[in-house]
Amino acid sequence: LASLPDFNPNHLMLSTDDARFNQATKGVFEMGSVFKVLNTAIALETNAFGLNEKIDISDPIRISRFRISDYHPLKRAVSLSEILVHSSNIGSAHISQLIGPETQRSYMKQLGMLAPAPLEIAETGVPLIPEKWTNITAMTVSYGYGISVSLVQTAAAISAAGGDGHYIAPTLLKRSPNVPIERVRVFSPDTAKAVRSMMRLVVAHKSGTGNFANIPGYLVGGKTGTA
C-alpha cells in the first residue's frame, strides 16, 4: 500500500508523525464524486432508475440554505451514463431520492462503508458516517460528501460495483488457493457490466471527466473525484 509521505523503517526515530500515518488505511476522507459510481450501481440494482431513462438536471437543487449545483451545467435531461460521464451532482442527488435514504444506507453497509476495513493491522480508520440518514444526507452521500471513509474501503466498494458484483473484504494476507474466497453478492452481473461500461465512458468519451487517463492500447475505466 502506497502512503505519502513515507519513511525509512530502518531509521524509525528519524521519521515524522505525518510520515508514519498510513493514508491508505487509517486516513478517512470525503471521497467526492468517486461515490457516484456506487450511487449509479445502487440505482440500477434496485430498478430506481434505468439505463434508458432520462432526468432533467437543468436547475440547481435548493433545500433551505443549501444549494446543489454542477461545475459544468448541462441544462437538459440526461441519462444515467451521462450523469456519471459528466459527473453531475444534480443528477446524482436526484437519483438518490429515487433510491431512498434507507436503501442507500443498506447498500453502503453491504459495501463495508459503515465500519472500519477488516484489515490485519491496527492502522484502520473509523469511518465518519451520518448520525441520521435523511433525504439530504442521501443527496450529499450520492456525490461523496457527508461521509468519510478510507481509501482501501473505497477501493473494495468500487471493485464490487465495477467488478463482478461481489464484495470481497480487503486483506493484507496472501490467500491460499485451497481456501474459497468469502464473497458477498451485492450487485447482479448485469449491473456490474453496465457500471463497467459507464466507467469506461468516463475515460473514453471526449467530454468525460477522466479522459486524461485514456491510454492508447489499454481499456481503462475509472471515475474522477475531489476528496
Predicted regions and their residues:
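Beta-lactam-recognizing serine transpeptidase/beta-lactamase-like catalytic domain environment
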Residues: 1-33, 38-227
